[in-house]
Amino acid sequence: MKIARIYIFLCWVLTLFSACTQDELFNISSGGRLSFSVDTLRLDTVFSNTSTPTKSFWVYNHNGKGVKCRSVRLERGNQLGFQVNVDGVFLGSNLGYQTNEIAVREQDSIRIYVKVLATATQEKDPQLLTDNLIFTYDDGKEQKINLRAWAWDAHVLRSLQVKKDTTISSQTPIVVYGGITVNENSVLTIAEGTTLYFHSGAALNVKG
């Protein structure tokens, strides 16, 4: 019986010690603020319905205590196509494009990854896409990181075979996938002001 009591007491002590350790790891500071490796994250220019390469930035806690955010969210949700991963958590529609209760230990950091999948803008010229990633603290204060990218509407040509005299004309860029092949006795004319961009592996091949 005595041994059983000692065992229970030891279990209680270990549980208490574990809880205290966790509290020490996340000793949340009510007034602490995070620091960022950028104040504006600029992504590449992207054609509509395609994705930019992923870029990232760091979030630092230079405080002597842990810092907790009530939420990290995209200000405009997914209206512009920005896709964000916060320390392994993807801000998708199932989460309302936000994550809650993000904590950064003292003198530690987390990494955030961002890309954008641009939709058609229905405009001739490149259009600026801009949103804010908002960090909200328990005291209601906020910090923002601005996200920027340019979206450019474009037509897509896939593995075009030119079998007769053909003219390509467009006021918006044309992205070529798979290449263009001009057969013998056929003429391909590219109208003045028309711009072609060839995707990786695509080329213009002229037979004969």
Place the predicted regions along the sequence by residue:
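Beta-strand-rich interaction surfaces with strong enrichment in secreted/lumenal proteins
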Residues: 44-45, 98-104, 135, 177-180
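C-terminal motif of bacterial Sec signal peptides marking the signal peptidase cleavage site
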Residues: 16-19
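Extracellular beta-helix/beta-solenoid repeat scaffolds
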Residues: 169-208
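Terminal connector regions
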Residues: 120-153
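Low-complexity, Pro/Ser/Thr- and charge-rich linker/hinge segments at domain boundaries
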Residues: 26, 145-167, 171
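Surface-exposed binding patches on compact interaction domains or structured appendages
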Residues: 21-42, 62-115, 120
